[in-house]
Amino acid sequence: MAKKEDTLVLEGKVEELLPGMHFRVILENGMPVTAHLCGKMRMSNIRLLVGDRVTVEMSAYDLTKARVVYRHR
């Protein structure tokens, strides 16, 4: 993705599980995005379920895709 200065950090809720470890996440502002897990979450075998609250990073250049960086308890 882009440099750290160009990323937006937002919170949302997992709405749907998609094939290939992708997720439909609805952000707090109501905008839907397609997200994938970051590498450290994959290596730690962290799984997401529908309804989980997550923190995502988005590029300022493409506001339709995101990366899940944290799953809230």
Swiss-Prot record:
GO cellular component, one term: cytosol
Subcellular location: Cytoplasm
Principal subcellular localisation of the protein: cytoplasm
InterPro entries: NA-bd_OB-fold, RNA-binding_domain_S1_IF1, S1_domain, TIF_IF1
Keywords: Cytoplasm, Initiation factor, Protein biosynthesis, RNA-binding, rRNA-binding
SUPFAM superfamilies: Nucleic acid-binding proteins (SSF50249)
A single MF term (Gene Ontology): translation initiation factor activity
Residues covered by the S1-like domain: 1-73
Protein purpose: One of the essential components for the initiation of protein synthesis. Stabilizes the binding of IF-2 and IF-3 on the 30S subunit to which N-formylmethionyl-tRNA(fMet) subsequently binds. Helps modulate mRNA selection, yielding the 30S pre-initiation complex (PIC). Upon addition of the 50S ribosomal subunit IF-1, IF-2 and IF-3 are released leaving the mature 70S translation initiation complex.
Quaternary structure annotation from Swiss-Prot or TrEMBL: Component of the 30S ribosomal translation pre-initiation complex which assembles on the 30S ribosome in the order IF-2 and IF-3, IF-1 and N-formylmethionyl-tRNA(fMet); mRNA recruitment can occur at any time during PIC assembly.
Similarity comment: family membership: Belongs to the IF-1 family.
Annotated PANTHER family: TRANSLATION INITIATION FACTOR IF-1, CHLOROPLASTIC
Official protein name in the record: Translation initiation factor IF-1
Species assigned in the record: Chlamydia pneumoniae
